[in-house]
Swiss-Prot record:
GO terms for molecular function: translation release factor activity, codon specific. Methylated by PrmC. Methylation increases the termination efficiency of RF1. Peptide chain release factor 1 directs the termination of translation in response to the peptide chain termination codons UAG and UAA. It comes from the Bacteria. Transmembrane segments: none annotated. The lineage of its organism: Bacteria, Bacillati, Bacillota, Bacilli, Lactobacillales. It comes from Streptococcus pneumoniae (strain Hungary19A-6). Pfam families: PCRF, RF-1. This is Peptide chain release factor 1. Its main location: cytoplasm. InterPro entries: PCRF, Pep_chain_release_fac_I, Pep_chain_release_fac_I_sf, Prokaryotic/Mito_RF, RF-1. SMART domains: PCRF (SM00937). Signal peptide: none annotated.
Length: 359
């Protein structure tokens, strides 16, 4: 099937989906309605671009016809030739754009995410850097018009984070932030360093797509739920009523503790969101590990402990090791202006996938 047949098939399917989504039987089936809605949304940009491309092709035909019928009118012929030139340039641009749009889509790209950041090697300095990363992602999310909610946080004594979990909601969140999973290294002089020596510390980031209950069922028998009293600073109980929740997924021993909310029900709901994402991610990672060759050909899906980026404060430098990108804009990037980095990662990923398709 050539590219034009593929595009026509996508448009035909898009129109079929529009009809299905107005079918009462589909509307009443929540799971099916969600699946079809997501499929329609994932094809929308391709269909819009294809329809615009067809208009450009028609513009070429019209311009060629105008040249033939100019009847010696030099001004008309010149105008038609310019229109033809512009339309042919547009045609090439659309063909490149459509090739990328036809690349296999990540089914999670449109999803919200669970973002986990942990201070790793480097003690207090690593925890402080985890806080810097949290602020960076918060500001980036704000610039994108996304909602950013801290769900769980474990702080250390100097204002850093041993671990922080956040929910980021909005349009195509996973498609942008999925490349952030991995080890982030910082090189700087800690505030506690009296000799002015540069120290190296690490924080790890994990990005998981949100998993809706209708998408991924966890057998209640596989869960152990403990209810206990929330504790404050120093470990004292701060609630007379037990509102904190610990959920353990027994087959994997994945556990989540939640005490941020005032009610047991809200803590339980948040804990279930996180554990559903972690369990789904756990099994997805196992499946991915079985496809090592494919995984290594793309970015953002490799070893979670892999060092992906270095933030060098003395040189105001950020280096993304996966694509060899170095920017002397550390202060700008940590303030949430991540577009240049994100765009480069997306472009690299698309280029790799195009090369795979052309082999």
């Amino acid at each position: 099937m050539n590219i034009y047949d593929q595009l026509q098939a996508v448009e035909d399917r898009y129109e079929e989906l529009g009809e299905l989504l107005s079918d009462p039987d589909v509307v009443s089936d929540t799971r099916r309605f969600m699946e079809l809605s997501k499929e329609e949304a994932s094809n929308r940009d391709t269909v819009i671009a294809y329809r615009e491309y067809k208009q450009v092709l028609q513009n070429i035909v019209d311009a060629e016809e105008m040249i033939k019928e100019s009847g010696g009118d030099a001004d008309l012929e010149e105008m038609a030739k310019q229109e033809l030139k512009d339309a042919k340039a547009e045609k090439e641009e659309y063909e490149e754009k459509l090739k990328i749009l036809l690349l296999p889509k990540d089914p999670n790209d449109d999803k919200n995410i669970i973002l986990e950041i942990r201070g790793a090697a480097g003690g207090d300095e690593a925890a402080l850097f985890a806080g810097d990363l949290l602020t960076m992602y918060q500001k980036y999310a704000e610039a994108q018009g996304w909602r950013f909610e801290v769900m769980e946080a474990s702080m250390n004594g100097v204002g850093g984070f041993k671990e922080v979990v956040a929910m980021v909601s909005g349009q195509s969140v996973y498609s942008k932030l999925k490349y952030e999973s991995g080890a982030h290294r910082v090189q700087r002089v800690p505030v506690t360093e009296s000799q002015g020596r540069v120290h190296t510390s690490t924080a790890t980031v994990l990005v998981m797509p949100e998993v809706e209950e209708v998408e991924y069922d966890i057998d209640p028998k596989d869960l152990r739920v403990d209810i206990y009293h929330a504790s404050g600073a120093g470990g004292q109980n701060v609630n007379k009523v037990a509102t904190a929740v610990r959920i353990v997924h027994l087959p994997t021993n994945i556990k989540v503790e939640m005490q941020e909310e005032r009610t047991q029900q809200k803590n339980r709901e948040k804990a279930m969101k996180i554990i559903r994402a972690r369990v789904a991610d756990h099994f997805a990672q196992i499946a991915q590990d079985e496809q090592d060759a494919e995984r290594k050909s793309t970015i953002g899906t490799g070893d979670r402990s892999e060092r992906i980026r270095t933030y060098n404060f003395p040189q105001n430098r950020v280096t993304d090791h996966r694509i060899g990108l170095t920017l002397q804009k550390l202060d700008t990037i940590l303030s949430g202006k991540l577009d240049e980095v994100m765009d480069a990662l997306v472009l690299y990923d698309q280029t790799q996938k195009l090369e795979e398709l052309n082999k």
